[in-house]
Amino acid sequence: NFPVHAIMMEKCDNTLDSLMCGKNELTEPEWAATLLQVIMALIAYQHMFAFTHNDLHTNNIMFVKTDKVFLHYLHKGTYYRVPTHGRIMKIIDFGRAIYKYRGKTMVSDSFDRAGDAATQYNCEPYLNPKKPRLDPNPSFDLCRLACSLFDYFVEDIRDAAEYSATLKESRVARMV
């Protein structure tokens, strides 16, 4: 006998990557709605589970098509009505996630000394007391996502200055 883990997932239509690389680029309102859906999901996960995804990029965000026009969120006493533009975004691939459940912190073995993410954090259960403590940070997920989006919007880092005026005007860029 050995333990078996089974991961089930809703069948999704495609990834955010597919929308970015498709024929029709996302409009600014579609980008804003997409990012707000992802941010609201992260807020809920972080609040309920002290959650950090640790690998949030555009291929780990999928969507299902919907006829719902809006999604409604309540956060810190404020209601948000976010248009769907026909898509509900889903965060996937929790293989590197760190979260708390029933008082216990769940950590992937990717963060073990032999794992491919060994030096990202220094905390239990893989704490090295000889090094400074470095706990998971919920802001990491949006930073990681922003890096993958930056890579999409800016082809060559040497040309980033050309985008600076455009980025200052873009509501989506200011969100990222």
Residue spans of the language-model regions?
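Acidic, Ser/Thr-rich intrinsically disordered and amphipathic helical segments
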Residues: 11, 15, 30-33, 37-40, ...
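Helical subdomain adjoining the active site within ATP-dependent kinase catalytic cores
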Residues: 121-176
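Conserved kinase catalytic-core helix
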Residues: 24-53, 58, 67-68
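Conserved structural core of kinase catalytic domains
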Residues: 1-29, 101-107
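Short, solvent-exposed segments of well-ordered alpha helices
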Residues: 3, 25-32, 36, 48, ...
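Catalytic activation segment of kinase domains across protein kinase-like and atypical kinase folds
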Residues: 54-138
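Short, flexible/disordered secondary-structure transition segments
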Residues: 19, 49-58, 63, 68, ...
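Extended HEAT/HEAT-like alpha-solenoid repeat tracts in very large eukaryotic scaffold/adaptor proteins
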Residues: 2-9, 86-91, 138-145
